[in-house]
């Protein structure tokens, strides 16, 4: 799946799942060396160091990550929340004609929610209305 990241004021750079794996490590750990990212991804998904460095370099080329020296420190230039928002916006446009209401209705129809989740959703809607 493709995620979009911010370029200027517009989210228009595509971030693929492999790049998202790297971004998730950076978001979870903050500024982190490429070597540390490689170690984490080797352990969690079995990537070798070359694969990890290739994907990190793609993230840098796309403007999602900044390389800082010394030690090839990776710094996220985009937040997880920005990527989430852009992904939701893209899904809404692509699958629901841009209708948040239709997308939300589909989510409700295709998933069972606990009482606590329902209460939390009601609270969020109430806060949004206020």
Which residue stretches match the model-derived regions?
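Short alpha-helical segments that sit at the start of domains
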Residues: 2-25, 82-83
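Short capping segments at the starts of secondary-structure elements
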Residues: 25-33
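Basic amphipathic alpha-helical segments that dock to polyanions
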Residues: 22, 53-60
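Short helix-coil-helix linker/hinge
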Residues: 15-18, 31, 97
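Short, cationic-aromatic polyanion-contact patches
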Residues: 13-18, 70-89
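A short, conserved structural fragment
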Residues: 60-69
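Short acidic, hydrophobic short linear motifs in intrinsically disordered regions
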Residues: 32-41
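Amphipathic alpha-helical dimerization/coiled-coil segments
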Residues: 88-129
